Design a protein with these regions (language model features):
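Patatin-like phospholipase
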Residues: 1-20, 28-177
Length: 177
């Protein structure tokens, strides 16, 4: 989200956005002309249950209650900046590009992490998180022939490996101490 703030501060407005998973959601919010500061406030409203039971599927509204009202009446064609998001057809095992029609079902599809959120039925398919196949859809962005692509990978690698030799060290790390 900091990248959006820097782009806004520098007066840089992309002519096209592509995203997958949470990047698709952030892209949709930004493409609908919501300022970066407001997107950050919306993101602070995201709620992941403290006690998540693996295999128990959550609802979109449980996790993203602040985003739903902002996107539910939009279509891709209404956006100020063209947007494409990727999802994966669960049965065919292929990447699907979504860039027309109602926005919210497409965003639910690109964010539908298997085992956390249910697959999104869309166009006769059952779609899940695009990150299952393509974490950083740079190829998707280039397919629209832009002059420049700015890619942001929010799944960072650790800067250093920490060896936890003692049981106490492992517990302290788990507790954030």
């Amino acid at each position: 989200l900091g990248v959006l703030e820097v782009l806004e501060t520098e007066g840089i407005r992309p002519t096209f956005l592509a995203g997958t998973s949470i990047g698709g959601l952030v892209g949709a919010l930004w493409a609908s002309a919501i300022p970066a500061a407001e997107i950050i406030a919306i993101a602070r409203g995201f709620r992941f249950p403290r006690r998540f039971v693996p295999g128990r599927v959550l609802s979109w509204e449980q996790i993203f209650p602040t985003a739903v009202p902002r996107l539910e009446h939009w279509a891709f064609e209404d956006l100020g900046t063209p947007l494409v998001v990727s999802a994966v057809d669960l049965l065919a095992g292929e990447e699907v590009m979504l860039h027309t029609g109602p926005l919210l079902p497409a965003i639910r599809a690109t964010c539908a992490v298997p085992g956390v959120l249910p697959p999104e039925p869309l166009g006769g398919r059952r779609l899940v998180d695009g990150g299952v196949m393509n974490v950083l859809p740079v190829d998707l962005a280039w397919s629209w022939e832009p002059e420049i692509v700015i890619a942001v990978n929010i799944i960072a690698s650790p800067r250093q490996t920490v060896r936890l030799d003692s049981r106490y060290a492992r517990i302290a790390t788990a507790l954030g101490r």
